[in-house]
């Protein structure tokens, strides 16, 4: 009888711990997922936009990887964990050199957040005046 109660108690403890862990999650909220640079002069050099990412979850948000869709686009991001209620940054730089005309580029963001991944988009038009 003691053995049955012990096993039952252990099972209940495991279930309660599992449900408590499910409640704790990082929730990444982005101010925007798309940025339009408008017209960019190719001779002006690279342009940068900073996307803000806020952690509205209970545990620290960690952006684990950020991948650009093209070599003309380079990302930089907050590497340290983003505490609950705090905001981090994902800076995306586009180099318009030798790329005249309209463009749309994406950056994939991976994290420990509830959603897991996001796609950010930058777009614009490179002019050669």
Short names for language-model regions:
Residues 21-52, 129:
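Beta-sheet-dominated interaction scaffolds and their linkers
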Residues 53-57:
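Asparagine-centered strand-capping/turn motif at beta-strand->loop junctions
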Residues 100-128:
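Terminal connector regions
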């Amino acid at each position: 009888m003691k053995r049955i109660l012990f096993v039952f108690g252990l099972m209940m403890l495991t279930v309660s711990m599992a449900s408590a862990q499910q409640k704790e999650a990082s929730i990444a909220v982005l101010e925007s997922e798309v940025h339009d640079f408008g017209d960019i002069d190719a001779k002006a050099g690279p342009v940068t936009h900073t996307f803000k990412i806020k952690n509205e979850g209970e545990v620290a948000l960690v952006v684990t990887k950020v991948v650009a869709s093209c070599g003309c686009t380079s990302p930089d991001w907050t590497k340290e964990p983003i505490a609950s209620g705090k905001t981090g940054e994902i800076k995306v730089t586009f180099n318009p050199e030798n790329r005249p005309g309209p463009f749309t580029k994406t950056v994939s963001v991976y994290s420990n957040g509830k959603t897991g991944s996001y796609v950010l988009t930058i777009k614009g038009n490179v002019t050669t005046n």
